[in-house]
């Protein structure tokens, strides 16, 4: 039987710190949050493998390394208010919540949203609010946000997300014109109308579905075989 606490520590040492993640807050969060609580029971022994894992609704829990990369790139700080698009199991929200003051997270699948609420409550994580809806609209009632990150890839950065960033806010999102192949981009809001954008690396995420993302009817019902492989949330370059 896998020793899960020991496996978690090895994951942080080898997959996270060992691959150039240096933010001490991110490393502490990855050590603190039990990933096994966010995966299906029959996959718990694989919780700390360097791979995404399938959950429900043809979605996945992201590869630990890419979660750490995205959150490090978002430069989260204590006191930050964060918006996540694509709750999934709730794992990335839990990691962000271990650093930031509060996390709003939006999930379009009601069953996934409810499961994430229950998991977060069971773990005593009380600074995450899970919302159900079209994440491409963001969450206007909670804006502005110090950081926004998306766990799904779209054809472009939704306008609402840019508008809901605070001045100095950071946005991390997979963007690409192919549904399962994207580049991870970082957007920083400099002034009311000026944004900096740069590419951090190549990634593969499930599609962002919504009014300002991919139309649901155009997305394949069954993701490609790679979707549940270690490259589903690709191993981004170490210079991210």
Region locations from a protein language model:
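Intrinsically disordered, low-complexity regions enriched for glutamine and histidine
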Residues: 61, 82, 107, 230-231
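Long, low-complexity, intrinsically disordered segments
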Residues: 230-240
């Amino acid at each position: 039987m896998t020793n899960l606490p020991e496996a978690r520590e090895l994951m942080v040492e080898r997959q996270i710190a060992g691959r150039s993640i240096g933010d001490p807050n991110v490393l502490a969060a990855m050590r603190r949050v039990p990933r096994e609580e966010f995966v299906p029971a029959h996959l718990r022994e694989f919780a700390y493998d360097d791979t995404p894992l399938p959950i429900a609704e043809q979605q996945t829990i992201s590869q630990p390394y890419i979660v750490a990369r995205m959150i490090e790139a978002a430069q989260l700080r204590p006191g930050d208010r964060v918006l996540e698009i694509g709750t999934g199991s709730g794992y990335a929200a839990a990691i962000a919540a271990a650093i930031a003051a509060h996390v709003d997270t939006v999930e379009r699948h009601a069953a996934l949203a409810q499961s994430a609420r229950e998991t977060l409550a069971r773990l005593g994580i009380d600074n995450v609010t899970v919302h159900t809806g079209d994440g491409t609209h963001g969450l206007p009632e909670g804006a502005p946000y110090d950081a926004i990150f998306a766990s799904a890839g779209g054809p472009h950065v939704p306008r609402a997300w840019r508008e809901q960033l605070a001045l100095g806010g950071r946005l991390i999102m997979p963007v690409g014109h192919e549904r399962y192949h994207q580049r991870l981009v970082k957007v920083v809001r400099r002034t009311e109308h000026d944004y900096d954008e740069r590419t951090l690396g190549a990634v593969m995420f499930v599609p962002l579905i919504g009014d300002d993302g991919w139309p649901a009817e155009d997305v394949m019902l069954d993701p490609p075989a790679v979707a549940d492989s270690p490259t589903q949330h690709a191993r981004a370059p170490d210079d991210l």
